[in-house]
């Protein structure tokens, strides 16, 4: 089974119950845990739009529920969604879009 299918299939189990459960920082530098990112690509400035979108893309694609709640901010994710969604695998994008709509 392709990796994208495995990630999409597990997405529902990995997402918090609500986007409102996302309590990540609104500013500062986030250092990703090693299980999410290879060495050298682990620091992301949350106040930099591009860095933040890269961070959120990695966490939504590879992260577990506790990673998402700790590293992703609900308000910033909603603001970034129009641009971020285009960079995600289509199955991940559709799953996240449904999840974000449900919580509005």
Locate predicted features:
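Long, compositionally biased intrinsically disordered regulatory segments in eukaryotic proteins
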Residues: 1-104
């Amino acid at each position: 089974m392709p990796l994208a299918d495995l990630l999409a299939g597990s997405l529902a189990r990995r997402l918090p119950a609500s986007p409102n459960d996302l309590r990540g920082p609104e500013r500062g530098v986030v250092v990703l845990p090693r299980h999410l990112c290879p060495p050298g690509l682990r620091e992301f400035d949350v106040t930099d739009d591009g860095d933040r979108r890269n961070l959120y893309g990695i966490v939504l694609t590879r992260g577990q529920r506790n990673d998402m709640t700790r590293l992703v901010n609900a308000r910033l994710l909603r603001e970034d969604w129009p641009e971020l969604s285009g960079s995600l695998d289509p199955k991940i994008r559709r799953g996240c879009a449904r999840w974000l709509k449900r919580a509005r």
